[in-house]
């Protein structure tokens, strides 16, 4: 029976047996309101860490891994993912930001800050004696009101392949808080071009598998470019092979350039010079045979997933057949998609109809180093693209990649659903007022919960104002008063201090699906946390029983 390894049978004075379970005194337990408050404290602590990273003036965090690797970022999902979080409920917040990142790609910081604020408000209601489940029910009702209100205040942004201004502005908003903000025009253009290159506008679908984001240290972020094709971090297998091939016919191989070997363990005994020469001749004959297969198919470039030795390399050079070796599986697949080629597992299967085609394949060198990359351009399938990111150090390249990922996701979300709400806390302030208005119509305890939900929504504009160096309470009350007076849902916090609170004029927008997801995910997490009222931590098995 499970669990009896820490139990012992003993007898009392009368000889009656009973079981004594050891290590019970080592178990720790939190119960009831204490447990709920412990969870709320953990979530508030995590939310406060990322709160200062919210908005265009949000600050970055330095994260140092156990092996000394440094990451500088203000991306909420990355900060939480790389933090050493031990508390079980705090781990749920990490998963919350990850699910927002996986589903929407942007708004990871906002969803964590909102969840922390909702639980902070719940703590105040618990102190007043309201049951956690009643609070969770009120939050669910308030969330439905807020989501419905978002639909009502949303605007539609029009775009087409010829007119991408609105997509460009949306991507620019996403990049405003990132390390690449000085080059946000350039990155926004790249994001829009990349997404439109692979998008199916009829089906409103974007295949992110066709967008590869690669990077190399050196140059500045302004040197980042979009390649209509594939960039591979490899070079030609021999320095004397041509560095530029036009009208390339590419054989994409997953079989090694080497003589066949038995699949079982084997040993070859060579006892004389003639036997060794015969083996050499056999190997050479096999190499020649493989090269003939490739040549007969009409290929003028070989891309191989495996390596090949110097002898094979020399024979390829002699036969004027440029080759690239040790190309990874994902790159092989992308090259096959881009060039309309087929991945060939055996030389015997190679034929002209399985070759990929590209206008130009060129080798590019960097600075004074011997670093080289292979660029495959003017491909048969123009839908595959690569963004090649540059930066002065690895940290900037990595953060630029993360920033670009957010911008790509924003553009993709608008292609899926082109309805938007306004940023700068405008949507949250408008929802807060709508929830407060609805709460006044509801009698009973739910009114308190809905009011708390409305107060929690105000945390986003408060944090934006705080991070921008404004007086947070004054900025929020001023904008809220204008919302009530003018009934304009596009008035938000002037984070960049342009002198206008009109987010429509500044074109600070958030995709509607992203904002809805934030509210729904944060509310679901709060319900889960408020329902847990007991924590039992088992004692360590390593301790001896005394």
From Swiss-Prot:
One of its GO terms (molecular function) is ATP hydrolysis activity. Pfam families: Cpn60_TCP1 (PF00118). Disulfide bonds: none annotated. One of its GO terms (biological process) is protein folding. It comes from the Eukaryota. Keywords: ATP-binding, Chaperone, Cytoplasm, Nucleotide-binding. InterPro entries: Chap_CCT_epsi, Chaperone_TCP-1, Chaperonin_TCP-1_CS, Cpn60/GroEL/TCP-1, GroEL-like_apical_dom_sf, GROEL-like_equatorial_sf, TCP-1-like_intermed_sf, TCP-1_chaperonin. It is found in: Cytoplasm. One of its GO terms (cellular component) is chaperonin-containing T-complex. Heterooligomeric complex of about 850 to 900 kDa that forms two stacked rings, 12 to 16 nm in diameter. Belongs to the TCP-1 chaperonin family. Molecular chaperone; assists the folding of proteins upon ATP hydrolysis. Known to play a role, in vitro, in the folding of actin and tubulin. This is T-complex protein 1 subunit epsilon.
């Amino acid at each position: 029976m499970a669990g009896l390894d820490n139990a012992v049978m003993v007898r009392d004075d009368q000889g009656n047996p009973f079981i004594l379970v050891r290590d019970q005194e080592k178990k720790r337990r939190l119960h009831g309101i204490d447990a709920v408050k412990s969870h709320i404290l953990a979530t508030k602590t995590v939310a406060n860490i990322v709160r200062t990273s919210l908005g265009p003036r949000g600050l970055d965090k330095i994260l140092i891994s156990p092996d000394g690797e440094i990451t500088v970022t203000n991306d909420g999902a990355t900060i939480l993912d790389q933090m050493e979080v031990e508390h079980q409920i705090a781990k749920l917040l990490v998963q919350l930001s990850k699910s927002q990142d996986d589903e929407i790609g942007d708004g990871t910081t906002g969803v964590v800050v909102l969840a922390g604020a909702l639980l902070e408000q719940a703590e105040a209601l618990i102190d007043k004696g309201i049951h956690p489940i009643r609070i969770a029910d009120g939050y669910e009702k308030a969330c439905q009101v807020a989501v419905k209100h978002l639909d009502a205040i949303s605007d539609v942004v029009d775009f087409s392949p010829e007119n991408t201004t609105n997509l460009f502005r949306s991507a620019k908003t996403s990049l405003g808080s990132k390390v690449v903000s000085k080059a946000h025009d350039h990155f926004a253009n790249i994001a829009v071009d990349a997404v439109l290159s692979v998008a199916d506008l009829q089906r409103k679908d974007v295949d992110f598998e066709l967008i590869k984001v690669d990077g190399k240290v050196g140059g500045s972020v302004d040197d980042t470019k979009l390649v209509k094709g594939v960039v591979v971090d490899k070079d030609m297998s021999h320095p004397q092979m041509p560095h530029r091939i036009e009208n390339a016919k590419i054989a994409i191989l997953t079989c090694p350039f080497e003589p066949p070997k038995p699949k079982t363990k084997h040993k070859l005994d060579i006892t004389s010079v003639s036997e060794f020469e015969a083996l050499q001749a056999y190997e050479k004959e096999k190499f020649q045979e493989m090269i003939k297969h490739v040549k007969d198919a009409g290929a003028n470039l070989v891309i191989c997933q495996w390596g090949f030795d110097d002898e094979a390399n020399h024979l390829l050079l002699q036969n004027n057949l440029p080759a690239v070796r040790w190309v990874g599986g994902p790159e092989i697949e992308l090259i096959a998609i881009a060039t309309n080629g087929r991945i060939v597992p055996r030389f015997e299967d190679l034929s002209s109809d399985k070759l990929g085609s590209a206008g130009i394949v060129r080798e590019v060198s960097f600075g004074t180093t011997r670093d080289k990359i292979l660029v495959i351009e003017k491909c048969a399938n123009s839908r595959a693209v690569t963004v090649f990111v540059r930066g002065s150090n690895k940290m900037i390249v990595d953060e630029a990649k993360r920033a670009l990922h957010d911008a790509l996701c924003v553009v993709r979300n608008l292609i899926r659903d082109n309805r938007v709400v306004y940023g700068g806390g405008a949507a949250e302030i408008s929802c807060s007022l709508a929830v407060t208005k609805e709460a006044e119509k509801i009698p009973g305890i739910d009114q308190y919960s809905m009011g708390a939900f409305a107060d929690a929504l105000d945390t986003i504009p408060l944090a934006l104002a705080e991070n921008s160096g404004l007086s947070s309470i004054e900025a929020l009350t001023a904008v809220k008063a204008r919302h009530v007076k003018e009934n304009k849902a596009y008035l938000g916090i002037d984070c960049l201090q342009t002198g206008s609170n009109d987010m429509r004029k500044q074109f600070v927008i958030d995709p509607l699906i992203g904002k809805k997801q934030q509210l729904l995910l944060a509310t679901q997490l709060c319900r889960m946390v408020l329902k847990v009222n007991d924590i039992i931590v088992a004692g360590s098995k390593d301790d001896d029983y005394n």
